[in-house]
Amino acid sequence: MLEKLSFLLHKFPLVSKCGFIKKLASESSNDSNIIRIPDFPGGAEGFELVIKFCYDISFEINTENIAMLLCAAEYLEMTEEHSVENLVETIEVYLNEVILKSLSKSVKVLQKSQDLLPIAERVRLVDRCIDSIAYAICQESQSNEDIVDWWADDLAVLKIDMFRRVLVAMIARGFKRYSLGPVLKLYAEKALRGLDIFGKEAKKMEAEQEHEKRLILETIVSLLPRERNSVSVSFLSILLRAAIYLETTVACRLDLEKRMGLQLRQAVIDDLLIPYYSFNGDNTMLDVDTVQRILMNYLEFEVEGNSADFASDIGELMETYLAEIASDRNINFAKFIGFAECIPKQSRMYRAIDIFLKTHPNISEVEKKKVCSLMDCKKLSRDVYAHAAQNDRFQENLSNSDSPAPATAEKTLSPPELSSYKNELSKLNRENQYLKLELLKVKMKFKELEKEKAFEVMSGSDCSSSVSTASVAKPRLPRKSFINSVSQKLGKLINPFGLKQGQTKQPKSRRHSIS
């Protein structure tokens, strides 16, 4: 009897070839014809193949059943001690001559062995398959320096523990560790498929499945080569998103952050847009703390205090990221300031600060001044500084600046010209405010006329003649006076910097944000 199935068999064919059954038969009472076999490897399917062998019924040994057959034969002690050319010897010949000489077949048998543990370990089937795979891959890599993906794709069918053991065996045989990057990437893409690491929705997986994927991810990270640039920063970013999403160990996440910091020069903005995975109701869009730690790793290991290197390498990238988080209405003042202060002041942050002030209009004046103090006006171009001078959100802070003029202007203008430049900026600002006021008056007058006309229409047909007379007598909208006023003001601005005849100047944008 096997599991819940009963097999009606003659004892002699089994006893003559199976030492285990012979022992059970001798120990059972003479009156009992039932032999129970517990925990049989391969189950009923494996036992049926053993029966065929004992009854000399032909069947095929192949990659699908050889692992099950070997474990069953070893369990039943079908060795040469009990019968010549017994099942164990037959399987060993096929295993050595066919299976272990083929990489793909060895991987297939190893995959089947995963469901036959621990007996597959005891008969050394797992170790022999792993050693065969490692040897074949090392031979392949020596003959072809370009790593072939086909064998990496074969390894992706293995469970993470077997996959790890194969890679360790490959390294022990001389495989170059930095070449493991593409293999790990391919395995991660298949094993971690289905994770919603680009969204912020609640997890939709069972606890057991989450634990399995967490174990896979932590193992992959532990196998990553230590050599810089052995894997892309984009792949590291995906692993980090998954690590945060699956709530892996802190050590795993910090390792990935450190690796990204070392390769931050190759990063693009999408690599840093890591969602803030919060399942407690926090609506912040991006994980600023994680990116800040990545930046600190970069500053510690790469820049070492040289701010010029920072500006040339990733200054623009960090300014772009700062602008991204500035547009988040849910990001608080302290977090924005904390990240911005990590960026050296020579990096121009006008756009990010402008977006933050526009998105957070209710912050206090003290906080507003603190935000504006992050910007070094000396590093602004003339056009940007002129734009900031006309921006309502910056005017007061620029006027109080110790050095309001941009550094480029100081280098190209003499002191009298610089003073004239500042006066022109102030004059332009006042005139801009005056034009806004004039436009507001016209809009108010226009609204009054619309209200009067609507009232006249509602008066009915009896008042039509009087309305017509009144409308004829009513003075028209003084558009001409407004146009003349605007023309006069614009006329004053034609040559604000004392340009010579024939010189031209680019028109200045009057918008309050720079795209």
UniProtKB/Swiss-Prot annotation:
SUPFAM superfamilies listed in its UniProt record: POZ domain
Residue stretches making up the NPH3 domain: 149-409
Keyword Coiled coil assigned: yes
Domain (BTB) ranges: 1-63
Keyword Phosphoprotein part of the UniProt annotation: yes
Keywords: Coiled coil, Phosphoprotein, Ubl conjugation pathway
Residues carrying Phosphotyrosine: Y350
Pfam families: BTB, NPH3
Pathway: Protein modification; protein ubiquitination
GO biological processes: protein ubiquitination
Region (Disordered): 395-417, 494-515
Residue runs in coiled coils: 418-452
Signal sequence range: none
Protein family membership: Belongs to the NPH3 family.
Record text about domains: The BTB/POZ domain mediates the interaction with some component of ubiquitin ligase complexes.
Its biological purpose: May act as a substrate-specific adapter of an E3 ubiquitin-protein ligase complex (CUL3-RBX1-BTB) which mediates the ubiquitination and subsequent proteasomal degradation of target proteins.
PANTHER family: OS12G0117600 PROTEIN
Protein name: Putative BTB/POZ domain-containing protein At3g49970
